[in-house]
Amino acid sequence: MSTSSHSGDCAAITSNSNSTIILSAIGVVFGDIGTSPLYTLKEAFSPNYGLAPNHDTVLGILSLIFWAMMLVVTIKYVTVIMRVDNDGEGGIMALTALTQRTMPFGSRSIYIVGILGIFGTSLFFGDGIITPAISVLSAVEGLEVAEPHMKAFVVPITLAVLILLFLCQRFGTERVGKTFGPITFLWFIAIGVVGVYNIIQAPEVLYAINPWWGLHFFLEHGWHSMFVLGAVVLAVTGGEALYADMGHFGAKAIRHAWMYVVLPMLALNYLGQGALVLSNPTAIGNPFYQSIPDWGLYPMIALATAAAVIASQALITGSYSLSSQAMQLGYIPRMNVRHTSQSTIGQIYVPTVNWTLLMLVILTVIGFGDSTSMASAYGVAVTGTMMITTVLMIIYARANPRVPRLMLLMIAIVFIAVDGAFFYANIIKFMDGAWFPLLLGVVIFTFMRTWLRGRKLLHEEMRKDGINLDNFLPGLMLAPPVKVPGTAVFLTADSTVVPHALMHNLKHNKVLHERNVFLTVKTLKIPYAANSERLKIEPISNGFYRVHIRFGFMETPDVPSALMCSKDHAGIDFDPMHTTFFVSRETVIPSANRGMPIWRDKLFVLMHRNAAPANAFFRIPGNRLVELGTQVEI
């Protein structure tokens, strides 16, 4: 796997030992799927499904859980999908960009793939809301097992833990993050040991590894068994994280962590819970905590809460990262992004995302009240994202001539059948809570599509009223205005049109700088732009330059740092102290007669008005900035 350099980062990246990387991956990647044993088997036998915890049913459910982990995580993600990377990066946003790169420029297929990617991203944000709520709530519910009278305190304690977690986000996770791996590793060892302890009491539970028991369950329960898949899929929530975090740890480390630690420990724990239920069917009320000896109950509650917090942290951090990528690709408005680490570029904090997530997580916990009710809502976001990932992977592989068509067809049939069955099993629970993540997804999707469409209309209007730059400059030189020392940098989305900021500067100030740079910043469909391709400078007239700066969608755009490289190009010697950046600030006026429906126009105006200023996003010093306003009707 190749690595690409970050902007402004000339230091070599030192590689850690494999064991250290694997331990870190366990802490970040597998927190979500690692806390699934807290609620999966309990949900499968909830009154919603009407299943009796008898011998055949228990073995059937366990077999479905085991083979769901094998098919969805081991085969689909670990073996197949993690082979598809965008210069080492994974995740639905990276896969969308990669798939679009295989298509002819301007084709409708790019638009359709973009729609799929946006909706998958919207569902991921919904997952980021439900995961912290259900993980922490399930962990704290262990208090009900230890002390039944504590039931009334479960929700308040859960809210306190979650609020504290979100309040601490602005300080970053660089220090405490080093403990995530060891704590999560201890969690997996602990649940594996508890599983072995219970398996010894009823070793016949090991028969559940035979897929016949899963097939027997389908034959025994018929169509009703499809409903139960809505609970079984909870065992593979977090599978998407293996792919999304591939760029941070590498495919090899994630595969090793899954095969040698996570999968064995999860399998042992699920089988252990099943063994307990075979011996004591009344334990089905909360088989995870019932399977733990009394002396270890409180330590396990503490460890489970820590693991749930770490799982939540991984989703929160992932939401920040995905938001940053979406901003770079133009899917959402610019937001304030703060870097919480001086040594690690990828550690960021996005306040708007943080407080929005906290508000929605609190409403989710209060609205659902317990993990059983929440489980009905959880699966839709997860299975929807997984199915979209599968479709995008198939579209990408179809464009690759090296992939045998027969093999691709077989993979497509199996993966779509499995994902489709899981998605259907969750969507039929619409009135039981599945409406919630779908509503979240539709709302986020609407915001993203409105922003994309609004930006396109805005650029079209500005281009329509614009003047061709190459035609404008010769006329300007015939009667040049007064020149002042220094460099003026005009940010523009279209390098062929005279920037509005330049027109306003000439109209009101009637001066021109010695050097004038028309700067366009472009985000590529790759994670990191190579330093050799970062900067393109084109002299267009005496004292005028057209400059393109390229960033990858995983990078934080730092315009001044990128311009420092211009000293290597003849004619421009970028001096920050003698440079003024000119930015046009558009005031958008909604119109009922063109573009989008008026309600979407007003939504776009609201988002545009609250977007972070360009200087903050591009890291331009405020004392070197001149902002000139213009009105645009869309």
From Swiss-Prot:
Residue stretches spanning the membrane: 21-41, 58-78, 110-130, 148-168, 180-200, 217-237, 258-278, 296-316, 348-368, 377-397, 408-428, 432-452
Catalytic activity: K(+)(in) + H(+)(in) = K(+)(out) + H(+)(out)
Predominant place of localization: membrane
GO molecular function: potassium ion transmembrane transporter activity; symporter activity
Keywords: Cell inner membrane, Cell membrane, Ion transport, Membrane, Potassium, Potassium transport, Symport, Transmembrane, Transmembrane helix, Transport
Keyword Mitochondrion: no
Origin: domain of life: Bacteria
Keyword Lipid metabolism applies: no
Places the protein is found: Cell inner membrane
InterPro entries according to UniProt: K+_transporter (IPR003855), K_trans_C (IPR053952), K_trans_N (IPR053951), Kup (IPR023051)
GO CC annotation terms, alphabetical: plasma membrane
Membrane topology: Multi-pass membrane protein
Record function comment: Transport of potassium into the cell. Likely operates as a K(+):H(+) symporter.
Similarity comment text for this entry: Belongs to the HAK/KUP transporter (TC 2.A.72) family.
UniProt xrefs under HAMAP family: Kup
Protein name: Probable potassium transport system protein Kup
Source organism (scientific name): Xylella fastidiosa (strain Temecula1 / ATCC 700964)
Biological classification of the source: Bacteria, Pseudomonadati, Pseudomonadota, Gammaproteobacteria, Lysobacterales
Gene, per the UniProt record: kup
